[in-house]
């Protein structure tokens, strides 16, 4: 008995000592953070900083260490990892199934690996997805041009433009044409108007993420500057705050500033007309698009050739995060998106109608915040900044790493403050999780592509039947009504697979939820194929066969690098779209394709050796 009491006492003592040591370390950490903050406040000349000039070069004069780190993104050599990196190869070449999943949508033509926050506006202005003439000439005749809403997360000038051009009207800002809004970015800090520098990424029109997006110029405290994020957080149960955007602790803010953009979103129609800035080019009958219709904007970053601003009316829309079903304090679940998008279906039915199946498809965008919320790191109070912007030493200073990159680039700083295992062990654990999720991802995508091809086949067969025709031709509405259950399964299956595909951690932020979504996607795709067989039989089509496409089948959809197929805007057919950027839209490294081939089906003998 006495021995048991002694043992229990020893255990309690050890736990108390461990607790005291942890508490002491936590207190010291907070003291060091506070001392660091006070040192910054004492040495920084905040009078030089203002929201009227968000140029990171200007802010960097006050915070040179942080600017130096941020600009490494511009200069670093392109590299790849199994599921990331900063080499902007074509993801359509690596994953040809995406051309089928997104058939009828601009992403099916141009989609490259991301290359860092510095490049977000450069790449947004260059992508073929923002080139009306190119898209109209290459199979997407209905594309009318991107709205300025796309600038919310691509341009550090967004708050300035909302205030000074849209006069504080967020709806008007979002509803203005992208290229029209770009023309209004001012020349600051000695930059000559309409010069190459004015067009460039260092404070000019191609400037991406900047300091002011996340920091208050008065004291560098964290804040939210994007109205869509603030509105969405309020819909979840947060309270507005005039300084921070919403009331939240500093630790919460270290995630919420990232949640301004690393989220799912859509452009919600207001149902009303709104007055916005347009362009007088619409009145010049000599200016035509490639298809011969009248130009209503000039796809160029400067005002030129007499083109000027004019007030016009257009359909109103607001950048919206679909979060009202996801309440504060809850982990996100994919069914919350089902519920949300079902409720707004009368206002917003889909991002696009699938070209092959006719399904109403929601195109998911970078939902890192949603997936992370239910993961083990979020449950333990770990913020985005803790992993992606860890503390590092710059001489005697302790600063957050501002190149904003994968934790695997600096495991010692990002991971080992909590995890005591070796760097090799931790890296292997991450890769093992990502390989597992990637297997589920490929399985789901191949299953959905199989469903798509089978649906297209049955649509064609039904279209030959008189009861599915009008005026002797296949009636798409009648066929879609017959296939409505299948089309709904396609919509929801693709939403799940697209969610994990668009979320940039290959499931690492929450592997359980990622795999749950993907298994649902596989199940829905197979259920859809079963229903196709039933519908075929009910309409007298015997022995309708469904498909089961694999890696080799999928490679047949490889689109290759992006080229002009016709003469457009002084570009000749056969010219490479990214002719001036050799590292963009090229083939992925061969070893990545070999790795993908072993994932579905999962070849453990090859993968485990890595």
Predicted regions mapped to residue ranges:
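N-terminal Sec-pathway targeting helices
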Residues: 1-15
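N-terminal catalytic scaffold of extracellular/periplasmic and nuclease hydrolases
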Residues: 4, 137-139, 199
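Primarily the internal scaffold of c-type cytochrome electron-transfer domains
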Residues: 7-10, 22-121, 163-208, 213, ...
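Non-catalytic protein-protein interaction scaffold segments in large eukaryotic complex-forming proteins
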Residues: 18-20
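Short linear recognition/processing motifs and adjacent strand/loop elements at protein termini
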Residues: 96, 116-142
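Non-catalytic propeptide/linker segments at domain boundaries
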Residues: 107, 114, 118, 126, ...
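A cross-kingdom signal targeting lumenal/periplasmic-facing segments of multi-pass membrane
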Residues: 135, 140-162, 166, 174-175
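Extended, compositionally biased alpha-helical segments that mediate assembly or anchoring
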Residues: 588-610
């Amino acid at each position: 008995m006495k021995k048991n009491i002694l043992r229990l006492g020893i255990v309690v003592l050890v736990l108390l000592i461990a607790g005291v040591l942890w508490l002491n370390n936590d207190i010291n950490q907070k003291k060091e953070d506070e001392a660091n903050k006070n040192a910054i406040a004492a040495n920084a000349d905040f009078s030089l900083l203002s929201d009227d000039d968000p140029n990171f070069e200007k802010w960097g004069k006050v915070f040179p260490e942080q600017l130096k780190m941020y600009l490494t993104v511009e200069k670093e050599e392109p590299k790849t990892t199994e599921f990331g990196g900063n080499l902007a190869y074509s993801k359509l070449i690596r994953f040809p199934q995406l051309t089928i999943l997104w058939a009828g949508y601009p992403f099916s033509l141009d989609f490259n690996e991301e290359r860092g926050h510095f490049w977000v506006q450069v790449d947004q202005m260059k992508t073929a997805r923002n080139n009306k003439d190119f898209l109209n000439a290459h199979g997407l005749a209905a594309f009318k041009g991107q709205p300025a809403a796309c600038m919310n997360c691509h341009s550090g000038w967004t708050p300035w433009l909302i205030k000074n051009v849209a006069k504080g009207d967020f709806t008007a800002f979002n509803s203005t044409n992208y290229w029209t809004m770009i023309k209004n970015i001012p020349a600051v800090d000695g930059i000559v108007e309409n010069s190459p520098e004015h067009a460039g990424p260092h404070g000019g029109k191609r400037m991406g993420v900047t300091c002011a997006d996340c920091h208050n110029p008065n004291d560098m405290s964290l804040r939210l500057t994007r109205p869509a994020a603030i509105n969405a957080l309020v819909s979840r149960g947060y309270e507005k705050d005039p300084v921070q955007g919403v009331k939240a602790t500093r630790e919460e803010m270290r995630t919420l500033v990232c949640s301004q953009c690393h989220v799912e979103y859509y452009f919600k129609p207001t149902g009303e007309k709104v007055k916005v800035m347009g362009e007088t080019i619409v009145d010049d009958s000599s200016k035509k698009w490639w298809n011969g219709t009248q130009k209503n904007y000039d796809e160029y970053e400067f005002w030129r050739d007499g083109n000027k601003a004019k007030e016009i009316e257009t359909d109103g829309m607001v950048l919206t995060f679909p979060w009202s079903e996801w309440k504060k304090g809850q982990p996100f679940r994919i069914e919350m998106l089902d519920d949300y998008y079902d409720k707004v279906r009368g206002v917003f039915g889909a991002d696009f109608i699938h070209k092959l199946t006719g399904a109403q498809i929601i195109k998911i965008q970078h939902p890192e915040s949603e997936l992370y919320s239910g993961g083990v790191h979020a449950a333990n109070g770990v913020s985005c900044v803790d992993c992606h912007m860890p503390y590092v030493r710059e001489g005697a200073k302790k600063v957050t790493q501002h190149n904003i990159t994968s934790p695997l680039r600096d495991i010692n700083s990002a991971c080992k403050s909590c995890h005591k295992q070796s760097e090799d062990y931790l890296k292997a654990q991450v890769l093992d999780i990502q390989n597992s999720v990637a297997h589920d991802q490929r399985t789901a995508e191949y299953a959905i592509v199989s469903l798509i091809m089978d649906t297209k086949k049955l649509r064609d067969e039904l279209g030959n039947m008189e009861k599915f025709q009008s005026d002797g031709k296949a009636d798409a509405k009648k066929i879609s009504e017959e296939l409505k259950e299948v089309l709904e399964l396609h919509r929801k299956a693709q939403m799940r697979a697209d969610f994990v595909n668009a979320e940039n951690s290959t499931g690492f932020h929450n592997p359980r939820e990622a795999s749950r979504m993907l298994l649902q996607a596989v199940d829905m795709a197979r259920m859809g194929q079963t229903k196709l067989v039933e519908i075929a039989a009910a309409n007298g089509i015997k022995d309708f066969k469904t498909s089961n496409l694999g890696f080799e089948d999928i490679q047949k959809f490889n689109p290759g690098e992006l080229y002009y197929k016709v003469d457009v805007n002084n570009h000749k057919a056969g010219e490479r779209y990214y002719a001036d950027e050799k590292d963009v839209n090229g083939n992925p490294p061969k070893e990545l394709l070999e790795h993908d081939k072993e994932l579905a089906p999962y070849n453990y003998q090859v993968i485990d050796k890595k």
